[in-house]
Amino acid sequence: SRSSEAKALGIKMGDPYFKAKEIIVKNGVHVFSSNYSLYGDMSRRVMKTLKYFGTEIEVYSIDEAFLDLTGISDELVELFGKKIRNTILEWTGIPTSIGIASTKTLSKVANHIAKKEKSGVVSLINTKDIDIILEKININDVWGVGRQLTKFYITNNISNAKQLKNISNTWIKKSSNVLSSRTAMELRGISCISLET
C-alpha cells in the first residue's frame, strides 16, 4: 500500500523496492514490511462493524466492502455514511473513506474523492454536477479499467470518466467488450454490477 505522498512521488503500486529505491532514498520515504495477520484481524473487525449497519454487505477485498443502503432516504444517506465512518473509527481506531452512489462504479468514484476530503465521506446521490466530477476522473482511475483498456480508450480519445459515460452504446458494442458497456452504464447511474453477498 502507498501513502498519498508516495503516490505523488511516482512510486507505483506493486513496484519492487529496487525499482523505487532511488526515489525512496532521495525523498526519505519510510518503508514498512507487511503484517498480514494483523491486517486480516483489523479487516474482520471493520467488516463486523459494517454488518451492524446493514444486512447486505459484499466484502470486496481486505480493505474494501460494498454496503446496500436501500431504505436510507437520499437526504440522510451522507449523514448515515458519516455515522458509519465515525463508528468504525471509534470501534476499531481505523480511519476510513466512504463513497456513496447509486452504482458500485460510481461509489468507487465517490470513494476516490472521499479519500481527499476532510470528512472522508462523499455522496454522489442526487448530484447535479456529476459530469463535472466525472470529467476530473482519469480513465485509468475508473474501477474495472485496467492498463490495456486504458491504452485502448486513450487511443480512441477517451481520457476521463465523463467521456466513457457519454460514449454511445453502438460504439462500445462495436469497439469494446461487455465489461466496458457495464462500466459506461454504471457511470450513467444504471446499476449493472450487483452486490455479491
Predicted regions and their residues:
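Long, highly charged, low-complexity intrinsically disordered interaction regions
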Residues: 76-140
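Generic non-transmembrane alpha-helical segments
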Residues: 45, 49-53, 83-92, 152, ...
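DNA-contacting surface of Y-family translesion DNA polymerases
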Residues: 141, 149-197
